[in-house]
Regions:
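Low-complexity, intrinsically disordered export/secretion signals at extreme N-termini
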Residues: 1-52
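Short amphipathic alpha-helical segments that mediate assembly, nucleic-acid/protein binding
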Residues: 14-18, 36-39, 59, 80-84, ...
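Amphipathic protein-protein interaction modules
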Residues: 51-93
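Short, Lys/Arg-rich amphipathic alpha-helical interaction segments
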Residues: 89-110
């Protein structure tokens, strides 16, 4: 059984832990919001150059997402082309994912 001082210490620890978790959640949300904004900005610059070809639209979305996450860069794009193609193909052949990707692109282009 905990004495009063131990209970106070435990409560303080739990409060500090909760505050730390909430602060981290706010930081993650902020980073997420920044990533979405960067994704939309990059995609807005790419989409006008691909026309209405769904495969190219999906490919541009994949490339924008991977670049925002730092997975592909100007220096390694050739090395990552197989990964981009594999992800693009996966989305292209899944009707639900394809429709979602195209809908996102249309929304960004409006």
């Amino acid at each position: 059984m905990l004495n009063m001082e131990q209970r106070d210490q435990q409560a303080a620890f739990e409060n500090n832990t909760f505050a730390a978790v909430m602060n981290h959640a706010k930081q993650v949300t902020s980073i997420h919001d920044q990533n979405i904004s960067e994704f939309v900005t990059r995609l807005s610059g790419l989409l006008p150059h691909v026309g209405s070809n769904e495969e190219r639209i999906i490919q541009m979305e994949v490339m924008a997402a991977l670049s925002v996450e730092g997975i592909i860069t100007v220096d390694n794009i050739a090395e990552k082309s197989a990964m981009v193609k594999a992800i693009t193909e996966m989305i292209k052949y899944d009707a639900e994912k394809r429709e979602t990707a195209v809908a996102i692109a249309r929304k960004i282009m409006k």
